[in-house]
Regions:
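N-terminal leader/linker segments that initiate helical-solenoid repeat arrays
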Residues: 21-77, 83, 91-92, 102-103, ...
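Residue-level recognition of tetratricopeptide repeat
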Residues: 36, 70, 104, 138, ...
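Alpha-helical repeat scaffolds
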Residues: 57, 61, 87-99, 123-135, ...
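Register position in tetratricopeptide repeats
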Residues: 49, 83, 117, 156, ...
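A structural motif in tetratricopeptide-repeat
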Residues: 33, 67, 101, 135, ...
């Protein structure tokens, strides 16, 4: 791999010499294709492909003079800014390169979101409409993103009929996304059918909607239906025993921490519903192993709703598969504050990272220490620690915890 990168640099260096000496590039008065600019540009692209976002930003920001001449630079720079959570810089840069006669999905997406957050819905919709025209740059989701965003722009202005009209445009195979957003719109507009729609969704066998037991619970709590909310979680725990969000919600109820459930999400805030929409997109890209694009949408989701900390688990998982162990470990460490369910899950995940980085002994010691800190370990804790011992060939210890 190192040999390949070195070879690429040599080729790029030779290319840069040719470009500098070219009369064609010499005539360009607005931009200078110097050896340093070309080197920084290609170093930035290589860093992006290797998932080194900070390094990519360092190189690309040195060649911002390319922005008016090199459209690919604009896209890569904007994506890098988002991955580094530099949203204000991303908004400003997008404004500086936007033109009416060019369609760039990421630029119109960010400008539309910026206007939407500032409640300038006319300008927001102008950019969201352009997303549909630029769908060829984002074929995985066709024009669904533009339609959902316009639906919420219309909803934010009190136009229920118009908002539902845009959702109706969504076709197969994205009907599951349409159903989710339709229910959130019902909730936003105080529709009396909201609870029934949630119940139909979570019992739908065409798709795994187990996650939305949490959102039904959240909705019931906001409507002071506490006993019904507890019943939803109790029933869903039986059916979806391994779902972290449901398990943690049950734990919140057991400790009378109902407000924590409400703090994650509020259907009266359009930003929260859009954050869930982008989370689902990020999840779909992750399932396709496109972790870079998944992270891009995940960062947007967290920007819109930074209260929904459980969603960070997807980001940590993506980083792990990208072999960005330090970033993954840091995020797992941060989600421990959510509650004991996520804390134990994070501890197991960190132990797995340490297994790759420092070996069995260090990894097992780490998980043992976390286990010993548990105030009231249950059957699942013992069973999962025993499994970890077994998987790492500590058979005698595993037998002890199995029994």
């Amino acid at each position: 791999m190192k040999f390949l990168i070195k070879k690429i640099y040599i080729i790029l260096f030779l290319l840069s010499i040719l470009l500098i000496e070219s009369k064609i590039f010499a005539k360009e008065s607005e931009i200078q294709y110097t050896k340093e600019n070309i080197s920084n540009y290609f170093s930035g692209i290589i860093s992006i492909n290797q998932n080194y976002n900070n390094k990519a930003f360092k190189h690309l920001k040195k060649v911002k003079s390319l922005k008016n001449k090199h459209s690919r630079f604009n896209i890569e720079f904007i994506r890098t800014l988002i991955l580094l959570e530099k949203f204000e810089q991303a908004f400003a840069f997008s404004k500086s390169v936007w033109t009416d006669d060019e369609l760039f999905f990421e630029i119109d997406l960010l400008l539309g979101l910026d206007y939407f957050i500032k409640k300038d819905y006319t300008n927001a919709e102008k950019h969201f409409e352009r997303l549909n025209k630029a769908a060829r740059y984002n074929p995985f989701f066709d024009d669904i993103i533009g339609d959902v965003l316009i639906a919420w722009s219309e909803a934010s202005q009190g136009n229920k009929e118009n908002s539902l009209k845009y959702l109706e445009k969504i076709r197969k195979p994205y009907l599951h996304l349409k159903k989710i957003q339709n229910i959130f719109l019902q909730c936003y507009f105080n529709d009396s059918h909201t609870q029934k729609s949630f119940e139909e969704l979570i019992h739908n066998n065409d798709y795994n909607f187990s996650r939305y037991n949490f959102f039904l619970t959240n909705y019931l709590l906001f409507n002071n239906k506490i006993m019904e909310a507890k019943k939803v979680i109790k029933n869903s725990r039986k059916e979806y025993n391994s779902n972290l969000l449901i398990k943690q919600t049950e734990n919140f109820f057991l400790n009378n921490e109902n407000e924590k459930i409400k703090n994650f999400f509020n259907c009266k805030n359009p930003n929260d519903s859009l954050a869930e929409f982008f989370y689902v997109i990020a999840n779909l890209y992750s399932s396709e192993k496109d972790y870079k694009l998944s992270n891009f949408y995940m960062k947007i989701s967290l920007f819109l709703n930074n209260k929904f900390l459980p969603n960070k688990a997807l980001l940590a998982e993506n980083y792990y598969y990208q072999k960005k162990n330090k970033l993954s470990k840091n995020i797992y460490q941060s989600i421990k504050s959510i509650g004991p369910v996520y804390s134990w899950y994070a501890s197991k995940s960190i132990a797995t990272i340490l297994l790759d980085v420092k070996g069995k002994k260090y990894s097992i010691r780490s998980l043992e220490n976390e286990f010993n800190l548990l105030s009231n370990p249950n059957f699942e804790h013992y069973y999962e620690l025993a499994n970890f011992y077994k998987d790492n060939e500590y058979y005698e210890k595993s037998i002890k915890y199995y029994s």
